[in-house]
Amino acid sequence: MRKNPVPKKLRGSIKPIFSKNFRDRFQVDLINFRRLRKRDPFGVLMRWVMALKDHATGLTFICALPRKQAHLVAYKLQEIFGFIGYPKIFHTDNGKEFTAKCVLELLRNLNPNIVSVTGRPRRPRDQGSVENVNKMVKRVLGSVLAERRLAGQNPNWTEVLGSVAAAINSQSGRCKNDVS
């Protein structure tokens, strides 16, 4: 086993990300669903899912996107932020769909005090929380689709995203700061 040449004192320690209140920090990521290409009820071919997680409460929002493009991401973010309000910190991976001019302008227009933080993709120290949500979305979506197929339905995955989000958000122990 090789020793690390940098002394332990000089190496950066892993610092967990803490958020105390709702909307302190939102983490967002895109999930690839290109192999499950399905049309939504309006005939649009959906290939991606955007997962947005409030870091303090664990509240998760998911929505389908036809393409991995910045203007579509900005539109969905504006829709979600219009409903629940904007975050203090907007945390993403370094993807071009999150660092594009239209997304940064949207954040600036909502509130010039929003801090946009980018981490490295698929890195547990930066993106671990939202990557866990991605896994959970895939797992819960699979079980909801299987359950509906057993009931004799042939559901489209884009039509059950609301049920998937509700299942994720209603799991026990999801809210970190729950005092009850």
Q: Locations of the language-model features?
A:
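Retroviral integrase
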Residues: 1-139
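Contiguous mid-protein beta-loop-alpha structural module that forms a pocket-lining wall or clamp
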Residues: 118-119, 127-129, 139, 143-147, ...
